């Protein structure tokens, strides 16, 4: 049943997006921001865009600070007790992104379940759930904001709120997963997991490689498949996997599946539908309404955006999102999306505020005829590949 629901929004992304926006606006119409922008009078996308300006973090920071002090019904209609602490690449100041119960259940967790469902559709004989998933999470433990609210990095918030049964399928234990000091953390993870039946690993490639090498040092094994013979899947994101793939294949010692995901504090946006796909499938029914702002519009007083159905191949965009966590027309300025050929979009982590952002965007546009982003990286960005975060997204 779950896969049929996935097919429904995958095959009808525009309808899914219209329904998401309607649900968001209806839910928040009696909040402070809903009353300010008269959400109850907004009946279509055009009205919504005309009424609500594009926001950046500094624009909504006063609202978030009030929520962190205990006020509610400000940005979203249900209580906000969790905040994901993140640092954007354009600022050394931390951001605190509100995490509602809806954004946990209907975005982050729902998307994770959909990734698992799509993988089982691809590999029906998978034994993924017969063992444990090794999760190399973030490094910020849960911290109190007040008597009711807490903050931590996204992985800490997700770990803390996950259902009890999820802990049975995950390793290492929470106290190790959320350690702050990475050298000690890697050592503890290695010691705790070498005797586990690990069937999947998820984490950023850099720290995963460090962990793999340490495990081989401890065990004296030739490769990771000798330590975890049932390992079949690696889930990754955060940076381009291209420069790391060969190292992973060598260290693991056998063929496994690789899945790329794109999630952040603001939401779970996309993932490969199955290993080997050229693009990431945009999640259009997960509490996020997407708009796309041409790079040339950045910095204007009234920047123009377009909808999903208006995205043009070969052009560059920055995503503007409205979410069930209370973000309204929020600009993800740390990420630039670039439309490519054959209904895919590649996304690389640049900075709209950076001095070379427009030049880089134009260069990416000039290379848009390349069919694979991996080829583009190898040919044009080989010396900088680790600094880029490149994705291709499939719309339909």
Q: Locations of the language-model features?
A:
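Short secondary-structure capping/junction motifs at helix and strand boundaries
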Residues: 94-97, 117-132, 199, 256-259
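Active-site-proximal glycine-rich helix-loop-beta segment
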Residues: 90-93, 334
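Conserved AMP-binding loop of ANL adenylate-forming enzymes
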Residues: 117-164
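Short small-residue beta-strand/loop micro-motif enriched in glycine and branched aliphatics
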Residues: 92-97, 355-358
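Active-site diphosphate/adenylate-binding microenvironment
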Residues: 15-83, 95-99, 106, 114-125, ...
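Active-site glycine/GP-rich loop and adjacent strand/helix microenvironment
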Residues: 1-40, 47-52, 63-70, 158-396
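Conserved helicase ATPase motor motifs in RecA-like P-loop NTPase domains
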Residues: 83-90
């Amino acid at each position: 049943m779950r896969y049929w629901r996935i097919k429904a929004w995958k095959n009808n992304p525009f309808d899914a997006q219209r329904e998401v926006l309607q649900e968001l606006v209806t839910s928040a119409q009696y909040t402070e921001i809903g009353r300010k922008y008269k959400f109850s009078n907004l009946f279509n996308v055009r009205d919504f865009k005309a009424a609500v300006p594009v926001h950046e973090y500094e624009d909504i920071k006063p609202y978030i600070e009030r929520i962190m002090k205990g006020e509610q019904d400000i940005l979203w209609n249900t209580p906000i007790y969790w905040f994901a602490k993140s640092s954007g690449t354009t600022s050394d100041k931390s951001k605190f992104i509100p995490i509602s119960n809806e954004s946990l259940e209907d975005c982050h967790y729902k998307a994770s379940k959909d990734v698992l469902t799509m993988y089982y559709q691809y590999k029906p004989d998978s034994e993924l759930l017969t063992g444990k998933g090794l999760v190399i999470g973030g490094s910020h433990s849960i911290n109190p904001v007040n008597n009711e609210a807490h903050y931590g990095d996204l992985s800490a918030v997700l770990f803390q709120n996950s259902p009890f049964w999820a802990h049975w399928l995950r390793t290492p234990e929470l106290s190790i997963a959320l350690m702050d000091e990475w050298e000690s953390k890697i050592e503890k993870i290695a010691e705790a997991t070498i005797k586990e039946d690990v069937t999947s690993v998820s984490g950023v490639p850099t720290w995963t490689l460090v962990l793999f090498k340490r495990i081989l040092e401890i065990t004296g094994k030739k490769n990771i498949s000798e330590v975890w013979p049932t390992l079949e899947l690696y889930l990754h994101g955060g940076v381009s996997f291209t420069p790391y793939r060969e190292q992973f294949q060598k260290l693991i010692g056998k063929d496994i599946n690789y899945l790329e995901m794109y999630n952040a504090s603001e939401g779970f946006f996309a993932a490969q539908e199955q290993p080997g796909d050229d693009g990431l499938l945009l999640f259009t029914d997960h509490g996020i309404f997407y708009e796309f702002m041409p790079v040339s519009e950045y910095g204007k007083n009234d920047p123009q955006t377009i909808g999903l159905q208006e995205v043009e191949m070969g052009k560059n965009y920055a995503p503007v999102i409205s979410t069930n966590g209370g973000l309204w027309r929020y600009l993800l300025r740390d990420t630039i999306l670039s439309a490519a050929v054959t209904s895919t979009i590649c996304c690389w982590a640049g900075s709209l505020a950076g001095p070379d952002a427009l030049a880089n965007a134009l260069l990416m546009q000039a290379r848009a005829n390349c069919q694979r982003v991996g080829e583009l990286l190898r040919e044009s960005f080989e010396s900088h590949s680790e600094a880029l975060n490149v994705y291709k997204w499939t719309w339909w």
